[in-house]
């Protein structure tokens, strides 16, 4: 017996078709409950390897494992219903060979049930992207500042701020598009360059510290909610939840210590005979 859902999720081809149209809205999520909230308003939910920083307190995304990504991908899939869920391929899961990348991507998609994967890199990863897409794996690219390369970059600095440095970044964008990616994240790239790339390539660009001209935007949820103590220049704080959460925890601790909580309304009495 076949089972058909009454709610249709967005797909990679549908996001590709948004090129030049209504901007694509994308946020990160790593949990079922935040995924349910994000799902109401976003086209794409990214299960980013930024979970290493946000959930686990790592200084970089390098320590994140494939199993960690799959586990949180499952949670986000259970919490969401309509958004396309994209799961990051973590450092070390795809760089060795295109075959390694395929096996990792298949694990992610089969075990999390997500709709696409994302990987970092341009020209050097084009062959891998093509290999995956030709075998049924939708791929979102990621160029510009690539956080998984922090140990070779040396710092999280914006890219392409001198026009003489534009060539390699433009080449990365073209390579990702021509390899069959359905979209590409452009991170921390000079605004004029990001706008030019958006105009020049045929797939949607998703900006993060890039340009309002991009075909969509993405932020880390905890950054835009004001839950992170520090956020990059490109983050706008759409909320300030950190102080409110701290105040609630402070009040809870105070009421427990003073025995004000739990009150009569929070406990169970005996059944009347």
Swiss-Prot record:
Q: State the protein's name.
A: 3-methyl-2-oxobutanoate hydroxymethyltransferase
InterPro entries associated with the record: Pantoate_hydroxy_MeTrfase, Pyrv/PenolPyrv_kinase-like_dom, Pyrv_kinase-like_dom_sf
One Pfam match, given by its short name, reads Pantoate_transf
Q: What class of enzyme is it?
A: transferase
State the signal peptide span: none
Q: What is annotated as the active site?
A: 187 (proton acceptor)
So what does this one do? Catalyzes the reversible reaction in which hydroxymethyl group from 5,10-methylenetetrahydrofolate is transferred onto alpha-ketoisovalerate to form ketopantoate.
The catalysed reaction is: 3-methyl-2-oxobutanoate + (6R)-5,10-methylene-5,6,7,8-tetrahydrofolate + H2O = 2-dehydropantoate + (6S)-5,6,7,8-tetrahydrofolate
Single GO biological process annotation from the record: pantothenate biosynthetic process
PANTHER family listed in its UniProt record: 3-METHYL-2-OXOBUTANOATE HYDROXYMETHYLTRANSFERASE
* Cofactor comment text: Binds 1 Mg(2+) ion per subunit.
Q: How does it assemble?
A: Homodecamer; pentamer of dimers.
The residues that hold 3-methyl-2-oxobutanoate are 49-50, 88, 118
Look up the coiled coil feature and give its residue ranges: none
Q: Name one GO molecular function term.
A: magnesium ion binding
Which pairs of positions does the record mark as disulfide bonds?
A: none
């Amino acid at each position: 017996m076949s089972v058909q859902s009454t709610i249709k999720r967005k797909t990679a081809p549908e996001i590709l078709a948004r090129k030049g149209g209504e901007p694509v809205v994308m946020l990160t999520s790593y949990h079922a409950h935040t995924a349910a909230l994000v799902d109401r308003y976003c086209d794409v939910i990214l299960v980013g390897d930024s979970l290493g920083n946000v959930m686990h307190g790592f200084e970089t995304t390098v320590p994140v494992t494939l199993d960690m990504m799959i586990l949180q991908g499952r949670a986000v899939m259970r919490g969401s219903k309509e958004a396309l869920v994209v799961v990051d391929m973590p450092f070390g899961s795809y760089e060795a060979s295109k075959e390694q990348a395929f096996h990792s991507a298949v694990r992610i998609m089969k075990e999390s049930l997500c709709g696409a994967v994302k990987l970092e890199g341009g020209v050097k990863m084009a062959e891998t992207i093509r290999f995956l897409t030709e075998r049924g794996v939708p791929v979102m690219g990621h160029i510009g500042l690539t956080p998984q390369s922090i140990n070779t970059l040396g710092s999280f600095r914006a890219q392409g701020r001198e026009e003489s440095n534009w060539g390699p970044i433009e080449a990365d964008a073209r390579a990702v598009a021509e390899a069959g990616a359905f979209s590409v994240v452009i991170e921390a790239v000079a605004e004029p360059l990001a706008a030019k790339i958006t105009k020049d390539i045929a797939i949607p660009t998703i900006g993060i510290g890039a340009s309002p001209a991009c075909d969509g935007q993405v932020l880390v949820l905890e950054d835009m909610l004001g839950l992170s103590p520090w956020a990059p220049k490109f983050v706008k704080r759409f909320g300030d939840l950190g102080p409110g959460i701290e105040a609630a925890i402070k009040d809870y601790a105070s009421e427990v210590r003073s025995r004000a909580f739990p009150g009569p309304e929070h406990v169970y009495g005996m059944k009347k005979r």
